[in-house]
Amino acid sequence: YLQSQERYESQKEICQVAKEYRRRGTGLDGIVLDWCSWEDGMWGQKSFDHSRFPDPSNMIQTLHDEDVHFMISIWPNMDPKCENHKEMKEKNLLLPFSDIYNARTEQARKCYWEQAKRGLYQYGVDAWWCDSSEPFTPEWSHTERVEPALQYEEYKRTAGDYLGEEHTNDFALYHARAIYEGQRSEEKG
């Protein structure tokens, strides 16, 4: 069983949830730290907010001691205040007119992985949830439910404006590839 909720607020909360599953004898294979693992206002930064997750290595080891794997959500978009964003921008690795890295280029994928490695993987992260892999999602701003066919057309048009219509479905593949190839390169050594 993989446990996830909208998000966990702290290292303490995650460890308590895993411990409670074990106390009850309920199966738990992994726990997901969804959005906001980063510092407040740093959306998409690939690092832990050390005020809420003061010792990520210890947190993950505590989970491993309970035979629980740790998965974290990572995002392709980064707030301009983030160090990750600044690095991507300085290296010209963002998609034009956006805060989303250009996963279709090898250099951007390698940079993205290095950021994930530095800020997250080094602590023992087991798995990745590549969130928002359809990075241009106009439905987030809707106030009313839109009929699915119209919503799909709106997505195609919006994503096509940024990626080119022929590439609206391949971003997720390249985004996942950044993590897959990056992590595999670490495990070969």
Residue ranges: model-predicted function:
Residues 1-189:
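Catalytic-domain carbohydrate-binding cleft regions of carbohydrate-active enzymes
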